[in-house]
Amino acid sequence: MSRTPSSLDKDKGSSEFVENMNEIEIIEHTRVPSDKPSGFGGHLIDENLVKVEGEDKVTPYLCFLISASAIAGFLFGYDTGVVGVALPLVGTDLGGSVLSSSQQEIITAGTTIGAIFGSAILGGWGDRLGRKVAILIADVFFTVGAVLIAASYSVPQMIVGRIVLGVGVGGAAAIAPLFITETAPTAVRGRCIGVNAFFIPFGQVISEAIGAGVQDMKNGWRLLFALGAVPSLFQLILFHYLPESPRILILRGQTDRARHVFSRIYPNATPEMIDYKFRVAQEYVTATTVLQSGTTYWQRTKTLFTKGSYRRSIVTVSLIQMAGQLSGFNTLLYYAGTLFSLLGLTNPALGGLIPAGTNAFFVLVGMTLVDKVGRRGLLMFGVPIMLAGLVWNIVAFHYLCIPTGGLLDTSYKYDTKLVGIVIGGIVFFTTGFGLTYSHLAWYQSEFLALEVRSVGSGIATTANWVANLVVSVSYLTELETLTPSGTYGLYLGFSVVFFIFAVFCYPETKQLSIDETSLLFEEDWGVKRSREMRRERRETQRRLADSEMTEVATAHVQAQKQKDSAVTRSELDNFMEELKNGAKRFPISR
């Protein structure tokens, strides 16, 4: 579909390069939804048609912005890892008796319960509060919760502290990826979201490492939980120097501040380019405001499940979130100390570093590949590795536990070789998980339309925590009733079902702008539509490049005519061929 020049293109303040682009027939995907007000003319402008020099590079300012935001991911990861190494150290400090399996499960699940509320409330109110304020509120809950846990002298007090902490974990998990998605340039958006995803296993590694070092320290578990308040206080300070999301600033009418944020994100852009980036975002926000006008938060939530395109998008991101949890990976962290004690390791906390470190490394690998290979490409490659790892675990645990009736027994010394095979299966499984769900689950904001992005992100993150709750409160019980092999067989069944769903219903978002990706679900689940949109985008870029070549060739011919009027058509064709052969010298963007 060719794009009709919009009022923005005709604006007197628009630069010459925008006007020139209107002379080219451009395939355009980005349109206001079909139920939009008629005043929008049926289309919106594609931000990617104008690319700034160095846009595919991570600038120092963008690095600061993304890193400060990703502390939320670190806090998420630290809490996930710390409970697994801290609970075995509690001993009789909470009520005078050793924690039972059910008490460990309830304490572990406390954060998950709080996170369900945090992601639903802070995530859902992200538009009204703003991304920045929502993250700051989450930091307050983080800090208060960490203090309550570290000062606990009873199981109920610790559970309350874990719930308070969980509100912060859930809220930050919903908002931080959303904030990053809305501020990062499309060319590096995958890597930027990946930083937040990487900080999750990085936090897990740090908690496991510190836990290994305080095994013999009195009240070491209190220190472990108290240290969780340090990153949240640090983020509170850093966010004082960070801007609000430019789209939220536009929504509030703070246009000068929004332009300033764009100029910081794109330091090499000309004023005209900044104006173009700003006006594109402004059109989307204006369209969204009209779509949201007259509706309440609960009405928009209902719309997510009644309108087909919204429903398909929220189902996709929610199921991908749940897939990561129901694979069982977090049980390796929540109960690392218990599991590796059962396997006979003398320092179980060091054993916890195995899945945490492997996950962190392969999240980093996936983060570097995601903008090249694509989200779907990584999923199709990595999940089969994860499934093979689960099969490995099923078989390995079966043979390991034959002497103890199929169950793990701390009083029995298992064969060292078989323990090594089990750990090898855990590493192989974690490799696939790190490449896929560990970070791809947090790309949820890419799939959601702006008008429901905040509430949708909150719902998807809530789905994550509900699945997390199911796993965390049942793992130790499952080991005792289903046996370790049966437990990982259950996780394998879940993972196979979710992978089949992903094959048919998880579209690629690579190369598409944040405001284009939500259009993938307009007609179906978007897998085929994504391929078509990305192919047409490549053709559009090629035509833009050819147009620049033509302009250069014409200027060359005119210069030659001044010297010699005998320039032939064949000479022009030869010159054009030379340009095409050396097209790298003529960038697509202006």
Swiss-Prot record:
InterPro entries: MFS_dom, MFS_sugar_transport-like, MFS_trans_sf, Myo-inositol_Transporter, Sugar/inositol_transpt, Sugar_transporter_CS. It holds the Pfam family Sugar_tr. Residues 87-105, 154-162, 214-222, 347-349, 398-417, 476-485 are extracellular. It is a multi-pass membrane protein. Keywords: Cell membrane, Membrane, Transmembrane, Transmembrane helix, Transport. GO terms for molecular function: myo-inositol:proton symporter activity. The chain crosses the membrane at residues 64-86, 106-126, 133-153, 163-183, 193-213, 223-243, 326-346, 350-370, 377-397, 418-438, 455-475, 486-506. Signal peptide: none annotated. Induction: Induced during sexual reproduction. Expressed during infection. PROSITE patterns: MFS, SUGAR_TRANSPORT_1, SUGAR_TRANSPORT_2. One of its GO terms (cellular component) is plasma membrane. It is found in: Cell membrane. Residues 1-63, 127-132, 184-192, 244-325, 371-376, 439-454, 507-590 are cytoplasmic. It catalyses: myo-inositol(out) + H(+)(out) = myo-inositol(in) + H(+)(in). The keyword Transferase does not apply. Its main location: membrane. Major transporter for myo-inositol. Plays a role in the traversal of the host blood-brain barrier. Belongs to the major facilitator superfamily. Sugar transporter (TC 2.A.1.1) family. This is Myo-inositol transporter 3C. It comes from Cryptococcus neoformans var. grubii serotype A (strain H99 / ATCC 208821 / CBS 10515 / FGSC 9487).
